[in-house]
């Protein structure tokens, strides 16, 4: 078994648990009339997991995949699971007000987003820039920096209107990256 096959398997298990959290909460989320913010978070997390799975294909393009690459991948996957678990816990059926729940856990959600983005920056600079090509720095300006800025704004400004705006921007950002990944049919994020 190649080293990247082990990494893909480990990431698949962790992201599979994150996906299970989303799927477990889905009926409770859609059978109740919930705040639209929680639907946006659900959509963003679905795209986050899909893009994370797809970009793992780039591991096969790395010539010198090492332990640090593996650790960064596990941190990214683990934080993604924490993000899904905080928003959609195992007791999702007992959540009475999704809006109250969102405002209870949203700081955890935004910190997890920041950690994922910073981990991705380290990973890109360490080794993935080889797989991404010479124009990889564009990814920072259209994807990662807006992601960090949105997350910082939402973390520090807890007003409902600010949360709305940031979640809409984050949803558009993720939708754009998912669409561009789909159109390119190559893992670029």
What name fits each language-model region?
Residues 37-60:
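A generic, lipid-embedded transmembrane alpha helix
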Residues 127-128, 176-189:
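Juxtamembrane boundary at the C-terminal end of a transmembrane helix
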Residues 1-18, 185:
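Hydrophobic transmembrane alpha-helical segments in integral membrane proteins
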Residues 27-40, 61-65, 91-103, 154-166:
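Membrane-interface helix-boundary motifs at transmembrane edges
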Residues 74-143:
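Membrane-proximal helix-loop-helix units in multi-pass membrane proteins
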């Amino acid at each position: 078994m190649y080293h990247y096959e082990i990494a893909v398997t480990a990431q698949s298990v962790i992201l599979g648990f994150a996906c299970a959290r989303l799927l477990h909460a889905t009926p409770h989320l859609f059978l109740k009339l919930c705040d639209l913010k929680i639907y946006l978070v659900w959509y963003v997390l679905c795209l986050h997991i899909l893009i994370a799975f797809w970009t793992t294909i780039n591991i096969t393009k790395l010539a010198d995949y090492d332990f640090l690459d593996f650790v960064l991948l596990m941190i990214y996957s683990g934080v993604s699971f924490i993000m899904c678990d905080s928003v959609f816990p195992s007791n999702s059926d007992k959540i009475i007000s999704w809006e109250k729940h969102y405002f209870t856990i949203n700081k955890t959600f935004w910190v997890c987003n920041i950690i994922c983005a910073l981990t991705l920056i380290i990973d890109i600079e360490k080794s993935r820039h080889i797989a991404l090509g010479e124009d990889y720095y564009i990814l920072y300006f259209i994807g990662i920096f807006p992601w960090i800025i949105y997350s910082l704004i939402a973390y520090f400004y807890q007003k409902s209107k600010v949360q709305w705006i940031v979640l809409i921007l984050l949803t558009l950002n993720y939708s754009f990256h998912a669409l561009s990944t789909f159109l390119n049919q190559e893992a670029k994020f």
